[in-house]
């Protein structure tokens, strides 16, 4: 791994060291970068980032990471996929320095489904239930844990939804890649599936309905179906939980009614194709996207590394380029490879398929490169931890 921009490599991952934050009660920023060949963890104190010297799970692709800061002690979760042993979910209670894999698979399909787990696409700590974690998988399914991610149970009503027989895989497989919970109501859950679209429950998962009105499916004979959209990612607004942002396979949308109706907000972007979207952690109406040229040309729009930000819920967009390469850039950002932390000003982060990781400590106004020459970056998560 190559590091730059005021970043220093950390000590060997097997050594347990006391951080400055632990020693004097300070907080630090934690950055987890899941790649095609392991999980890289960076820690920031006093403006300096230090990456642990070697990756965790270096023989596995890490498709999903969660940093659960709800309890007295943060817990990290990672969805790894070993070419030999298959997929698994690991957890760490010491900020990623050591990891535990349950004796029995945390996520598995019941025998009567006839399905087998291919990978865990999403790990999501519930907003209103302290011990609940959701997992989204491939084949597309939703799982619920009530022990902070050590064991999960299949949410059968979604698995058995009447439309399931008509779901088809997207280019990256048939994955449930987005889970959003509502801090106002633990029974309200929104998920997104590629390629099936957005589905919602208002009764804790007992029943589900498609929520794709206004979202296009340009590749289907009917471009406005009830379900079947290739939704790439959905994020929830910080100030208004009913406002959502959606990056589609062609099209960027917002909803002001929790997904009942969607409005196209792509005007002002150089392309409406892309994978990633993220919401500002505190500021309402503020979200980020990373435009890609086209579905047949999956490189940054105009070959320039540009994050676009809206501060008015999609009425206008501004490019954020300070510190980012603007010539001959080909690093595509995947759906879970952009995120924000919960700092103020907010940290914004993304990694790309060139193995580069960039970070902003000022809401996206300026950027610096944290790492280069990593394996293909699949997911990025960050948080302020004690």
Located regions from the model:
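Extracellular glycan-interacting surfaces
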Residues: 2-386
